[in-house]
Amino acid sequence: MSTNDDLKTKFVRSVDDRNSLSNVGARWTKRELGRFESDDHRGTTLVVIGGVHGNEPAGLIAAMRVLDTLNAEEPTGFHGQLVVLGGNLPALNSDDENARYIDFDLNRIFTDEQIAMPEDTSVEHGQMQELLAALRSIRAQSERMIVMDLHTTSSDAPPVAVFEDSIMAREFARQMPLPIYLGFEEELDGLVIDRVTNELGSVAIVVEGGQHNDPQSIVVHEAVIWAGLHASGILPIGSLIGSFAHETMPGDVLRKAVGDQAYKVFDIRHRYAIEHDDFVICPGIVAGKKIKQEVTPIAVENGQEIVSPVRGRVFLPNMQETKRVGDDGFFIVRHIDEGWLGFSARLRKQEWIHRIIAHLPGVYRIDDAGHGSLYVDRDIAGVLKRQVFHLFGYRLIRHDQHDGGHGVVRAWNGMTSFCKAFFRGPIPGGPDENDPRFWIVRRHHLDRIDRIDRADR
């Protein structure tokens, strides 16, 4: 068993003080801040990442508390590894307590193009390379890796789980009583969890644990880590009943924090990117508020009211002290019936359905080494809508807000769009990859891995 004891000693020990963000005196100087492992540590590894944004240290504080408990109790039921990694160390160590990042948002640059750039391109490019190297090394040494990226929010909102919607990720996340938000990766490029999922083939989820400076966010994140250890099969939670950390069961902590939102599922429908640093969320706009399409003012930017092109609920309204052009202004989400997920899981496993989809008029396979990507005529895509692609397990890589209508109008538009594509005939050689008339969709990577694994059994 091992951990970085020198870092642990920098945390105050009294229960009251441990709940306070302001009492943490540690300087985050190491990429790997600690680990706890059993003798058979080549099994499952749970990686906890905290501080990807400098003003969000709660996840790291919670992770160090978990390591403290594990080292104090040395539970015999522990099989595997828990590894804690720091995210944006310079931003975490900044004298500006509101510093989210130094040059670039670290959680937006894990793309192929940015990874290919020199480490000295920016502070965050160097941090990205170090963090990615650590994750690759851990994955190479583990039979199975699961990553939990812990964050907090600028607005007052209940804890939530966010991940790419694969069946494997669902099975892991739904063992925790958190509301689930799907489709983030379709609106944001360069997420840490997106790189982990699609390069390293591992389940990866983001957990937003509460508001930045709320001490309860530490308690929530600690409960999330214990629940993650249990869900991954590394440590049955019953092994720690009676310890000071488990006077309240982790699941009960999370249920209390989320209230009636437990296990509810939402789909992200729109992201507004800030275009001017004079951006303010309107009074009364809070996470979860219902808004009307093109009606409800959500923010004021450079003197102009901002409304949403879609209806739904507000998610993650930006209340940061400092805002930069390109930052997330807000998201709009809609609730999904839980029965939809079960139906979706059954459909995704039917390979004949995917073969039919690929041969529909206006749909073209993309030669991408078996990743299951398709070009889809935007008129047809607008009729099918993103929720239908999600149902069959496709992620939107390139899309727009084109809407094929509702009810009878949608049925008519669908019929005419398919007829046009049918009589037009296939495009020789397929569409140009930059043709905006076509959406690009791709099957979820972990669903394809799961299919291959099942076929090999």
What are these regions (language model features)?
Residues M1-R457:
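Structured catalytic-domain cores with a bias toward divalent-metal coordination
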